[in-house]
């Protein structure tokens, strides 16, 4: 649901403090690094596809650059973009909990605050499930394994989502 994904952004934007908290700097750093990581992965894939097209080599496995370390570095980076936003929103979320909401009693305010916190964490989980299982990695890999010779070997030797060293078989 789009409202869960937007929740951390709305919370971060609600911050009334004039200075940044450490977690906001960390979140911004993660967000910016992940955005660069995603752009590099997408650019590497684009160059790979262009080079394969020029060489008339179709249905090849992209295992260059960041694609050596995981099969979907662009999806991983997209997920980290959202986690950076969530981390950036934590100080604002904690400030919301400290505010007294005059039109709500304290018990209802606490429950609402709990739901908002759960929603922020759920946004990360929801994005992960979407990128890996619903629309991303798993569906695309099914077709890649069918049409790309060597893709099953790539699957056996390379992490799906989280970047890391080659797997030892």
Q: Where on the chain are the PLM-derived regions?
A:
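Hydrophobic transmembrane alpha-helices
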Residues: 1-5, 9-44, 53-169
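Membrane-interface helix/loop boundary segments of multi-pass membrane proteins
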Residues: 47-49
